[in-house]
A protein has these predicted regions:
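Repetitive beta-architecture junctions, highlighting loop-to-beta-strand starts
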Residues: 2-4, 13, 47
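Short secondary-structure boundary segments
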Residues: 1-9, 59-63
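Short loop/turn segments that connect beta-strands within beta-propeller blades
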Residues: 8-12, 53-55
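Serine-hydrolase catalytic core recognition
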Residues: 26-186
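A short beta-strand motif characteristic of beta-propeller blades
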Residues: 13-19
C-alpha cells in the first residue's frame, strides 16, 4: 500500500510514517501546506477520509460512505489474503471474490486472474465496486475469482522481486500461481 512518510533531507533522523492506517493512502495538501486530506481504503474496506496536520496528527474524520444498501442486496467485499510463493519464503498478497450467495458447503470453479507484469501486477489496492478484470462480475456467475501478485511484478517490492521473471515473461508466474492456489484450497 502507498503511505505518506516524512524524512529529513540532510540524512539525519528517522523516517516517520504520517499515514499509519492499513490501506492505500492518497493525500492532498491544503494550499497553506499545513494540513493533509488523507483518503485511504483497501479492497475489503470502504474509503475513509481524515484530516491531519503535517506532523501526521489526526485532527478529525470526515463522514464515511454508507454501504447499507449494497449489503441489503447481498453485495460482499472481496477477501484479502496472503500466501507463500513457490520458493516457500516470499509473501504474495491477493484478493478473492466470491458469489454473493456463496455457500461454504458447496464447491465452486476457480478462475485465477494472472497478470504479473512486467512493471506491475494486478492486485486491487483500493475499495472498488467493479474491477477492470471483471472479477466481481465473474463471481456473480458462480465462480470464485482469485488474483495475487507474483514474483516478477511490482518494482515497489524490491529489485529481486521485480526482476524475477527477467528473460521468461511467459511462464514465470505459473509456479507461484499454482502454489498459491494449492494453499488457498488446502
Amino acid at each position: 500500500y502507498a503511505r505518506l512518510n516524512r524524512v529529513n533531507l540532510d540524512g539525519k533522523g528517522k523516517i516517520k510514517m504520517l499515514t499509519p492506517e492499513e490501506g492505500n493512502h492518497k493525500v492532498t495538501f491544503s494550499p497553506s501546506g499545513r494540513y493533509i486530506i488523507d483518503t485511504y481504503s483497501r479492497p475489503d474496506q470502504a474509503p475513509r477520509n481524515v484530516v491531519r496536520d503535517v506532523s501526521g496528527k489526526l485532527l478529525f474524520t470526515l463522514e464515511r460512505p454508507d454501504l447499507n444498501n449494497l449489503y441489503a442486496e447481498g453485495w460482499r467485499e472481496p477477501e484479502c489474503f496472503t500466501v507463500k510463493a513457490a520458493d516457500e519464503e516470499t509473501d504474495l498478497y491477493g484478493v478473492m471474490w466470491k458469489p454473493m450467495d456463496f455457500d461454504s458447503t458447496k464447491r465452486y470453479p476457480v478462475i485465477a486472474y494472472v497478470y504479473p507484469g512486467p512493471w506491475t501486477e494486478y492486485i486491487p489496492l483500493d475499495f472498488e465496486f467493479s474491477s477492470p478484470s471483471g472479477a466481481p462480475q465473474l463471481a456473480q456467475l458462480g465462480f470464485v475469482v482469485v488474483c495475487f501478485g507474483n514474483r516478477g511484478g511490482s518494482p515497489y517490492r524490491g529489485r529481486d522481486y521485480h526482476c524475477y521473471g527477467y528473460g521468461n515473461l511467459r511462464d514465470y508466474p505459473l509456479a507461484d500461481n499454482k502454489y498459491g492456489l494449492e494453499q488457498l484450497i488446502a
